[in-house]
A protein has these predicted regions:
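Bacterial N-terminal signal peptides
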Residues: 1-6
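Lipid interaction determinants
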Residues: 9-125
Length: 125
């Protein structure tokens, strides 16, 4: 019997949710990226991201029996968006985006551990 893991996103790390997008002060111009996003392109994983216009975010991910939730701050620095979860959430995170790369119509995800997989796509109304 061969078993395959279809969700290789696990990379247990609570190092203040390492971000590879250097933190900068939240700029009003970043508000253009504020909105509600859904993760696409990762099998058997559901995730939502809400980037608020005030520089705060809410994030949720479910895979198998693991549910992850975080709130915190976000910023845009050049072509990347960084997320920093509040400490009460970060200490429990096993899966978390370390970087979101801004593309034309979506945010490509790099997870803790450096794996790129999936993209957050803005919800349509």
């Amino acid at each position: 019997i061969t078993l395959f893991c279809t969700t290789p996103l696990y990379a247990k790390s609570n190092d203040e949710n390492q971000t590879s997008c250097q933190k900068v002060k939240f700029q009003d111009t970043a508000q253009a990226w504020a909105g509600h996003y859904y993760l696409q392109g990762v099998m058997e994983v559901g995730s939502e991201l809400l980037l608020e216009t005030n520089g705060k975010f809410k994030w949720y991910l479910a895979v198998g029996s693991l549910d992850q939730y975080a709130e915190g701050t976000w910023w845009k620095n050049g072509n990347c968006i960084g997320l920093k979860a509040l400490p009460k959430y970060s200490k429990h995170l096993e899966i978390f985006p370390s970087r979101l790369d801004v593309e034309e119509s979506h945010l490509t995800v790099t997870w803790i551990g450096g794996r790129q997989d999936g993209a957050y796509v803005r919800a349509t109304q």
